[in-house]
C-alpha cells in the first residue's frame, strides 16, 4: 500500500500540518462533529483501500480544528480480518508520522472481561496482550508508556487483549484472557500499535467499553450492540477525547 500516495491525497484537503492525529473506532465517528472548518476525503477516493464496508466505520479522512488546533482524523480504521496485512493496517500510522504531530491518539470500541467495570466506561491502554497467535502459538505482552493521568470515575487504566476477529470470542477463551490479565478485548488497534512501536511513537490508546465479553452476561454479543452502546456513550466519549486532545503536548 503506497502511503505516499495517500499523503498526496490528504495534502489536497489540509491547509497546515496537523498537531494531533487520531483514529476513530466503531461507532465513535460523532467526534468529527466537533471539528470546525472541516474538509474530507473518502477512502473510496483513494485507490489504495479495499471497498469493504463495516458498520460504524465511515471510512474517510477528516481535517479540522478544535480550539485552533489542527487535527487529522482517520474516521474508520482498517482491520486484519478484512484481508489487510499488519503493515497495511498500520499504514494510517505511517501517514500520520509524515506530519510529525505532537500527539497520536488511537480509539476503539471494546468488550470488557472485568465485571467491576460498566458499559459506557473508558480505558487507557497501558499494556497489550497479543492473543491472536498469528506468529506463534504463545501469547505475548507489550508495555506502553503511560502518557496521561486524567482523573475520571469512568476512566480506567489496563490491558487491551487483541484477537483476530471477525467472530467474537468463546466463553472459554474469555476465561483464559481474564486469567492472563486482560481487561478488555478487541479486534483492532494492536496492528496500529505495532507500527507505532516500529516508528518509536508513543500513542495514547483510548477504549470505549461497549459490551461485556462472551459469557459474562447471558445475552450473546452482537456488533449492532457495540455500535448502539458506542452511540449512547458519545457525549462522554467526545468530552473525554476532547480533553485528551487539549492536554499539554506529551509525545
Describe the predicted segments one by one.
Residues 1-139:
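Metabolite-binding pocket within alpha/beta catalytic cores that recognizes anionic/polar moieties
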Residues 93, 174, 190-193:
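Generic hydrophobic/aromatic pocket-lining and core-packing "Φ" positions
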Residues 96-100, 178, 197:
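Non-catalytic positions within long, well-ordered alpha-helices that form the structural scaffold/packing
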Residues 102-103, 183, 202:
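Short acidic/polar active-site loop segments enriched in Thr and Asp
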Residues 141-150, 164, 171-174, 230-242:
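Polyanion-binding loop/helix "lid" in catalytic or ligand-binding cores
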Residues 148-186:
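Active-site/ligand-binding-proximal alpha/beta "capping" segment
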Residues 187-225:
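Zn-dependent metallopeptidase/amidohydrolase metal-coordination segment
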Residues 214-251:
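His/Asp/Glu-rich mid-to-C-terminal helical/loop segments that flank catalytic regions of hydrolases
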